[in-house]
């Protein structure tokens, strides 16, 4: 089985690495900031219409292409984006949300292929295929 879709949006620049550390009863904890909660909600809302009827159960390759807008920059369509955030951190957050929505049973099944680009049409392209 293979699923692919494009979510038009300006991709987020916050990742799980941007959690805030707090101390509660002498113990350190990481909590989502209001901004990170908004990013997760935005991604969840865009992912929800694409959840498969049944989750993938075996290994899957998840290709994610994060495309930031070229408008107002000196970058050209298709140029690799080599600035933060890290593609690995973006894909970790994406896969955690996809697991919670029911794309697959556990994100340990995922063989990630994240890429970052500048694009005339911003958004996130996702392809999921059974291996």
Where are these regions (language model features)?
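Acidic, proline/glycine-enriched N-terminal capping motif
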Residues: 1-131
């Amino acid at each position: 089985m293979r699923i692919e879709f494009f979510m038009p949006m300006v991709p987020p620049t916050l990742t799980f690495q941007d959690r805030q550390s707090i101390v509660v009863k002498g113990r350190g904890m990481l909590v989502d900031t209001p901004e990170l909660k908004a990013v997760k909600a935005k991604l969840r809302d865009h992912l929800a219409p694409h959840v498969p009827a049944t989750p993938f159960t075996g290994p899957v390759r998840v290709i994610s292409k994060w495309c930031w807008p070229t408008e107002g920059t000196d970058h050209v369509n298709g140029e690799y984006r080599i600035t933060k955030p890290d593609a690995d951190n973006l894909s970790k957050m994406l896969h955690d949300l996809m697991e919670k929505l029911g794309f697959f049973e556990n994100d340990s099944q995922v063989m990630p292929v994240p890429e970052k680009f500048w694009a005339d049409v911003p958004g996130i392209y996702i392809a999921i295929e059974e291996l």
